[in-house]
Amino acid sequence: MANQYEVLGKAPGPEELKKLSPNDVHLTIRGLSAGYGKMEILHNFDLTVSKAQSLCLIGPNGAGKSTILHSIYGFTNIFSGKIEIDGKDITNLTPAQKLSSVGIAYILQDNSVFPDMTVEENLLMGGFTKEKQDEAYEEAERIFEKYERLRNRRNQPAKVLSGGERRLLEISRALVMKPSVLLVDEPSIGLEPRYIDMVFEILRDLQQTEKKTI
């Protein structure tokens, strides 16, 4: 049986990875080894991502794609290496610190909508770390203005939303903190085909119009 290197080819080195993000580097990962408990999943991992770039990680189940996102956000144990935003070392910051002070938001692959809360209440949960709650309300209004699907259901329980609308709500909730980086884990998982294009169009708009790094 062919091994993974024969099937996928030689793993790219640091210089080859830099070619994917040649300008205005925003996120840098250097020599990262990380995992859960004492188990090391990532081994000496490198990555660079430019500002307003959309970069997709592709690989088989168990390859470590989610672990990379978890490590950036602070959900794993870091054994060695460094994670930087604009040259600032953020390796040991907590998830809350990365969200509030660095501008990194994580959108889980599992359904994280609170079904019995209204769409507006779900949206405002995204601003729970804001010191001034008025700012969360202002950002929520901007989001309602941008997305008619959510605006029309703002006072309805989230459980009435379609799968695509729930994913839109999850993405929008992350936007309340006005992040510069969106970590999106399996954005199309569990969605009907008719909603998949909608979700990717939303992400493309956030990258191109609002200059988010995704």
Where are these regions (language model features)?
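ABC-type ATPase nucleotide-binding domains, specifically the catalytic core motifs of the NBD
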Residues: 37, 55, 77, 117-138, ...
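The feature captures the beta-strand-to-loop junction immediately N-terminal to the Walker
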Residues: 58-60
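Helix-to-loop junction immediately C-terminal to a conserved catalytic motif
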Residues: 73
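Conserved ABC transporter NBD signature motif
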Residues: 81-89, 100-101, 135-140, 145
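Conserved ABC ATPase signature
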Residues: 157-161
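A short, proline-enriched helix->beta-strand linker immediately N-terminal to the Walker B motif
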Residues: 176-180
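Catalytic Walker B motif of ABC-type/P-loop ATPase nucleotide-binding domains
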Residues: 182-186
